[in-house]
Amino acid sequence: MTALKTEQNIGRITQIIGPVIDAVFSPNKMPNIYNSVVIEGKNDVGDTIKCVAEVQQLLGDNVVRAVSMSATDGLMRGMTVVDTGAALSVPVGKNTLGRIFNVLGEPVDELGAVSTPEGMLPIHRAAPAFVDLDTNLSIFETGIKVVDLLAPYRRGGKIGLFGGAGVGKTVLIMELIVNNNIAKAHGGVSVFAGVGERTREGNDLYQEMCESKVIDTANLANSKVALVYGQMNEPPGARMRVGLTALTMAEYFRDVNNQDVLLFVDNIFRFVQAGSEVSALLGRMPSAVGYQPTLSTEMGSLQERITSTKTGSITSIQAVYVPADDLTDPAPATTFAHLDATTVLSRNLAAKGIYPAVDPLDSTSTMLQPWILGDDHYDTAQGVKQTLQRYKELQDIIAILGLDELSEEDRLTVARARKVERFLSQPFFVAEVFTGSPGKYVSLAESIQGFKMILGGELDDLPEQAFYLVGNIDEAVEKAAKL
């Protein structure tokens, strides 16, 4: 939280509409935009109330309009509002690892206060200067076949996981954090921002991290991740700012400790949604599909800070909810522009039981270039895409006339495409309880070798079910022997 100024600038509440608070201050003593203000007092039954809000508008007649970061229950007109004189500030540094925070930087895991020898940093900061940015191109291996082969992630880049409700965005994020031990292999730390998602998911993630020792409950100093949560039940102000709280913690590790940081955001759409709610509460005219007119600016102010400098990097993996599975909706469409790689999850593949339900033809990456990946990887990826694209084109003919009406060449393409489609599935560590199969980490070299063998016709005699939910190609051959 923000330390109060010695000479307090005090106002009074004049109006409360849900999470929006209007307060009047003395002339020439108005708080600045983005200053945090604190309201303390007692409600009707004598309970102490403390509410923190962020100034959003100066309305004239010495009145400011602020958006609350917590519930406004029990607040009354006439209550004292204290201007802290600064933006909301949150704790940073190694003591944040292994802990769970809310938007204000207050620990909510009942493990006591956080000592912050490194101090506090304001959540509103400028993006790094253009000359300080790092332009190095290298791949970030995840151990997930479909990702590493067809839409590889850039180390120090921004990655979006796009999908509608219930197709597996959160499971994919949990897999990337927990059981790949990316944070450990990466030699850095992770920060997880839970933006407007379910409390149950936040709790599940914490338990998973404790079990896999990403969070070491016995010795928090050995932990590799800090968690920042602003769930669905929080006011829109908290959901709109919790991403910035997490980003501020990540920036400290990058800029001061010169570390490589992984920033996970689940879900960036809720950040936009909260901004839309706040925009409406502040009386702004909505733009397309009811979104806030400042959508691009808000998204840019967050995304431009998630970047890699010459001293450290932030690799960001963001889940993006796609309303009604419509990728042209303004929220996902605005997010697309900022990303280096997009992993699109498909409801059709999920319905077929192919998990992770990543659409190999819709997913893209700026890293899929022969001069970055090498010809072997690039040619295999293109071969897989061409085979799947041809299969997609033939599906209408197959539905009407059946497989028998296809030419010999097309029948072979379809058989290989179906094997490729199944081989793109993979058992996850975090989904062991659902699949009954132990999780698998498949190296990039193994992935390339497996797909080359399928496309080259070396495995034409194996049944397609042998390729379903296995790790590398050797496991598929073993499974075929048992069928």
Curated annotation (Swiss-Prot):
GO terms for biological process: proton motive force-driven mitochondrial ATP synthesis. Keywords: ATP synthesis, ATP-binding, CF(1), Chloroplast, Hydrogen ion transport, Ion transport, Membrane, Nucleotide-binding, Plastid, Thylakoid, Translocase, Transport. Its main location: plastid. Pfam families: ATP-synt_ab, ATP-synt_ab_N, ATP-synt_VA_C. It catalyses: ATP + H2O + 4 H(+)(in) = ADP + phosphate + 5 H(+)(out). It is a peripheral membrane protein. SUPFAM superfamilies: C-terminal domain of alpha and beta subunits of F1 ATP synthase, N-terminal domain of alpha and beta subunits of F1 ATP synthase, P-loop containing nucleoside triphosphate hydrolases. One of its GO terms (cellular component) is mitochondrion. The keyword Methyltransferase does not apply. It is found in: Plastid, Chloroplast thylakoid membrane. One of its GO terms (molecular function) is proton-transporting ATP synthase activity, rotational mechanism. ATP binds at G163, G164, A165, G166, V167, G168, K169, T170. InterPro entries: AAA+_ATPase, ATP-synt_VA_C, ATP_synth_F1_bsu, ATPase_a/bsu_AS, ATPase_alpha/beta_chains, ATPase_F1/V1/A1_a/bsu_N, ATPase_F1/V1/A1_a/bsu_N_sf, ATPase_F1/V1/A1_a/bsu_nucl-bd. Its EC number is 7.1.2.2. F-type ATPases have 2 components, CF(1) - the catalytic core - and CF(0) - the membrane proton channel. CF(1) has five subunits: alpha(3), beta(3), gamma(1), delta(1), epsilon(1). CF(0) has four main subunits: a(1), b(1), b'(1) and c(9-12). Belongs to the ATPase alpha/beta chains family. NCBIfam families: atpD (TIGR01039). Produces ATP from ADP in the presence of a proton gradient across the membrane. The catalytic sites are hosted primarily by the beta subunits. This is ATP synthase subunit beta, chloroplastic. It comes from Ostreococcus tauri. The gene is atpB.
